[in-house]
């Protein structure tokens, strides 16, 4: 037993009294303290079974779009000895579509016609399609189509996996549950927003979209940069210019027409830059009137790639969250009109107001154009957030995410460009304490953010990029930065050119997984709120505890109801056809990769369980609780069958962590 750890006293009968080795397991550093009757032991000397594997929380910020980068090469012996550890870097969870797919024209109309006629590669005969369609889904939780039940009609029509609940199978007549007016009311209360118009997206794809504001602000920023370069190199520039002019005089007749034209263009450009510099150098040229952003004591869910999808955010709204964010969208694919990227700003109507879109970029032009495209094409956005904290290697090497911490001048240019083009949508930023362990730089960066930008909010994650999740977040430093921000704001107020700025919201982030942490961090009056990430994945009811200011020992049935809500929201979003159900099941398993980590309060000797504490293998108070806590991805699939029916042969799911991949014999 570690002598630095206090021994936990607990009542136990003589026959239940654990041996010394059991006590070691329960009180070891980094291990959750469980009641001995819930710890699973597999030998006579009292040692517990080893844990299934360590959690790697890089999943919080990694998605299939970003994880296909080559893994580090590991030498043979080491690789073989750790074959069940680490991440499945090249996993591909894309789902297979139907082989005999129904033509979209016939999805809700058996008598429709298709302009491609016999040349169409899809099925036109509805009865033929139904004869080859996979068996219908019928579960205890969803005996009828949940979408049809909530909206009054099912957009999936004959493709729906619950078809018999809203179709006369003899006449193939589709049934509506409510009249048109009633269905409109239901739609108003349950629909998705931020759909980009098809023509506008096509303009982006064909590069016909006019980035008028971006072009202008980028020209101003370039002029400022050029002037600064000239000022720094005045003497050197003068000598160079003199030498160049001498050369030109000596070789006047040899200068080509093309070179002259190029020189004229450069001269015109430099004159234009000089004009812009003189016009704007003493102004906050990027300032725009914005909607007020209020994050004070709001319950905020962090942007979460892959798992932070629309159904999850909708679930968190139902469970008490005030502010949610999209998954991180990459700026360049947004500018190019990529479908997968434009799916990310979509939100449920319950999320707005209080919904932010997060983008990642490496260049100023990317930030400005992505922000302008968003502001012009989506209306349900409360803020646009610049991700300057993502630790993923692929993005870091490209200059995105936390790489901007190493280049604060570029970060500031990105934010100012975004602020100018985003109309009345506030711009915010999320940063880390730094990139290298032991070298925090957030204090110096936040000073520049306060004085040189108009950001409406700053979120600080209390770790460096290098630390990732190996150490606890440094909340002392986060509090120090929060205090400094108010000092910098006071300094800004003294400057007549800067004092028009609104109060900057400051949000702390990192390791908050219970209501006591929440209120402890907010004892610092300079902290506006706390952003919750993994804590809200493992325990989605965390904001209910914040409101009640007490811990809630959710039963297995209550937790299963939470999963039911998630599945219902997933089918509303991805659909109830075969492909949609596969997508729902896949993201259900992604959600379970965090949700299973909850250790029930009733089996713990010490509570709360910290995020970096891992339990020994345990059994729950009932079989369902044990199943919900399983680390085996096969058990997650069993849980999914309660909601989505039997897993078909075409379904594909590879867990993020290899330690979750084992099969139970």
Curated annotation (Swiss-Prot):
Its cofactor is FMN. The keyword Zinc applies. One of its GO terms (cellular component) is nucleus. Its EC number is 1.3.1.89, 1.3.1.-. Residues 63-72, 233-244, 257-266 have a biased composition (Polar residues). Residues 1-97, 233-268 are annotated as: Disordered. FMN binds at residues 303-305, 358, 430, 461, 509-511, 533-534. The keyword Transport does not apply. Keywords: Cytoplasm, Flavoprotein, FMN, Metal-binding, mRNA processing, NAD, NADP, Nucleus, Oxidoreductase, Repeat, tRNA processing, Zinc, Zinc-finger. It is an enzyme of class 1 (oxidoreductase). Residues 75-88 have a biased composition (Basic residues). GO terms for biological process: mRNA processing. Pfam families: Dus (PF01207). A zinc finger (C3H1-type) spans 97-127, 139-169. Its main location: cytoplasm. GO terms for molecular function: flavin adenine dinucleotide binding; mRNA dihydrouridine synthase activity; RNA binding; tRNA-dihydrouridine47 synthase activity; zinc ion binding. Belongs to the Dus family. Dus3 subfamily. Catalyzes the synthesis of dihydrouridine, a modified base found in the D-loop of most tRNAs. Specifically modifies U47 in cytoplasmic tRNAs. Catalyzes the synthesis of dihydrouridine in some mRNAs, thereby affecting their translation. This is tRNA-dihydrouridine(47) synthase [NAD(P)(+)]. The gene is DUS3.
């Amino acid at each position: 037993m570690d002598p630095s750890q206090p021994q936990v006293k607990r009542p136990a009968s003589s026959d239940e009294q654990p041996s010394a080795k059991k006590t070691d397991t329960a009180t070891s550093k980094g291990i959750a303290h469980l009641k001995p009757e819930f710890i699973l032991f597999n030998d006579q000397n009292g040692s517990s079974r080893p844990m299934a594997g360590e959690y790697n929380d890089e999943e919080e910020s990694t998605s299939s779009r970003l994880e296909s980068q080559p893994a580090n090469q590991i030498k043979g012996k080491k690789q073989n000895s750790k074959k069940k550890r680490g991440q499945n870097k090249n996993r591909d969870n894309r789902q297979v579509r139907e082989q005999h797919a129904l033509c979209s024209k016939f999805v809700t109309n058996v008598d429709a016609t298709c302009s491609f006629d016999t040349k169409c590669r899809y099925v036109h005969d509805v009865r033929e399609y139904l004869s080859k369609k996979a068996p219908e889904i019928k579960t205890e939780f969803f005996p009828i189509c949940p979408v049809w039940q909530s909206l009054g009609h099912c957009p999936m029509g004959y493709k729906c996996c619950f078809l018999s609940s809203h179709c006369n199978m003899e006449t193939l007549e589709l049934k509506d549950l409510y009249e048109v007016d009633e269905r409109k009311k239901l739609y108003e209360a349950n629909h998705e927003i931020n759909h980009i118009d098809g023509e506008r997206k096509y303009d982006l794809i064909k590069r016909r979209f006019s980035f008028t504001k971006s072009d202008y602000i980028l020209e101003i920023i370039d002029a400022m940069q050029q002037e600064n370069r000239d000022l720094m190199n005045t003497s050197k520039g003068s000598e160079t210019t003199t030498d160049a002019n001498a050369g030109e005089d000596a070789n006047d007749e040899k200068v080509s027409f093309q070179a002259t034209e190029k020189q004229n263009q450069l001269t015109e450009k430099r004159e234009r830059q000089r004009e812009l510099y003189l016009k704007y150098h003493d102004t906050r040229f990027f300032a725009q009137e914005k909607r007020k952003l209020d994050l004070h004591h709001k319950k905020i869910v962090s942007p979460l790639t892959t798992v932070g999808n629309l159904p999850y955010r909708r679930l968190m709204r139902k469970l008490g969250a005030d502010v949610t964010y999209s998954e991180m969208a990459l700026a360049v694919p947004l500018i190019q009109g990529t479908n997968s990227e434009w799916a990310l700003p979509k939100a449920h109507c319950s999320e707005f107001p209080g919904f932010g879109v997060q983008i990642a970029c490496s260049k100023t032009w990317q930030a400005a154009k992505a922000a302008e495209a968003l502001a012009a094409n989506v209306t349900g956005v409360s803020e646009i957030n610049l991700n300057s904290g993502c630790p993923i290697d692929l993005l870091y090497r490209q200059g995105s995410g936390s790489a901007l911490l190493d280049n604060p001048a570029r970060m500031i240019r990105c934010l100012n460009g975004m602020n100018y083009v985003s109309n009345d949508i506030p711009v915010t930023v999320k940063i880390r304490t730094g990139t290298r362990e032991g070298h925090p730089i957030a204090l110096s960066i936040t000073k520049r953010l306060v004085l040189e930008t108009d950001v409406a909010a700053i979120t600080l994650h209390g770790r460096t990029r290098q630390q990732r999740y190996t150490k606890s977040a440094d909340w002392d430093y986060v509090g120090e930065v929060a205090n400094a921000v108010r000092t910098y704001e006071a300094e800004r107020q003294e400057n007549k050119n800067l004092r028009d700025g609104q109060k900057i919201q400051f949000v702390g982030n990192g390791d908050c997984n219970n209501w006591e942490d929440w209120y402890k961090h907010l004892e610092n009056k300079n902290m506006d709120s706390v952003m919750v990430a993994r804590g809200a994945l493992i325990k989605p009811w965390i904001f209910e505890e914040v409101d009640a200011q007490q811990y809630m020992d959710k039963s297995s049935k209550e937790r299963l109801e939470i999963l039911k809500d998630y599945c219902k929201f997933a089918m509303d979003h991805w659909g109830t056809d075969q492909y949609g159900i596969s997508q729902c099941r896949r993201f259900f398993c992604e959600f379970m990769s965090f949700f299973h980590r909850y250790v029930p309060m009733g089996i713990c000797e010490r509570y709360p369980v910290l995020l970096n504490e891992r339990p020994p293998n345990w059994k729950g108070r009932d079989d369902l609780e044990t199943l919900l806590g399983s680390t085996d991805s096969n058990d997650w699939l069993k849980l999914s069958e309660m909601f989505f029916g039997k897993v078909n042969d075409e379904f594909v799911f590879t867990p993020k962590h290899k330690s979750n991949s084992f099969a139970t014999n």
